A protein has these predicted regions:
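Extracellular adhesion/carbohydrate-binding repeat motifs centered on closely spaced tryptophans
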Residues: 1-11
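Zinc-dependent deaminase catalytic domain
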Residues: 3-4, 15-20, 24-184
């Protein structure tokens, strides 16, 4: 397949800076000439999780989750924190951890295609609580990437102690840039 030459302009460089691309941008880079500026998969999926979180009625904390195939080619499920399907769109309590809402991870896991027998990655705007971590371990998730660390690290601790790869968004994004996985 023949790729057309990409003209790398100052506008492209500014776009890349706004998107958070931190590596040196040069028209001499063959990947830049061929592809222009592209976000990493970690950034792409975390952006999707952020957008999904906007569907939440939780006024205190909106959380979004996306589950994808490990090769980044398929979205398997999305979820956000909220009430059960016909439930009211209101909190049981404004006290942290007692909203009564179903967690974003649970909503995504309930809808996930379990006939998909390949490694799955989960991107979540906030790290999971311990109860959600237990469900994640039962769901054959190979990697979890979180945006913001939850007030209690028990969920992350449990996942890591059971051998699940857990990365902050910053770690996942840097790893992809280092290995240039996002160019594929």
């Amino acid at each position: 397949e023949q790729m057309t030459e990409h003209s790398f302009t100052a506008d492209d460089q500014e776009f890349c800076r706004r998107c958070g691309v931190s590596r040196h941008l040069s028209e001499d880079d063959p990947d830049i000439r061929r592809l222009g500026c592209r976000p990493t998969w970690a950034k792409s999926w975390m952006d999707v999780a952020q957008i999904v979180s906007l569907r939440s009625y939780d006024r205190r904390l909106r959380v979004g989750t996306v589950i994808v195939s490990a090769d980044n080619t398929q979205v398997l499920s999305v979820g956000y924190n909220g009430n059960f399907r016909v439930g009211p769109h209101q909190h049981e309590s404004l006290e942290p951890g007692k909203s009564g809402f179903i967690h974003a991870e649970v909503n995504a896991l309930v809808k996930c295609n379990y006939g998909f027998h390949k490694p799955k990655h989960m991107y979540i705007t906030h790290s999971p609580c311990k109860d959600c971590a237990k469900l994640i371990l039962n769901a054959d998730i190979a990697r979890l990437v979180y945006g913001v660390k939850y007030r209690d690290s028990a969920g992350i601790d449990l996942l890591e102690s059971c051998g699940l790869e857990v990365l902050s968004f910053e770690e996942a994004d840097a790893l992809e840039r280092q290995t240039k996985l996002y160019l594929n």
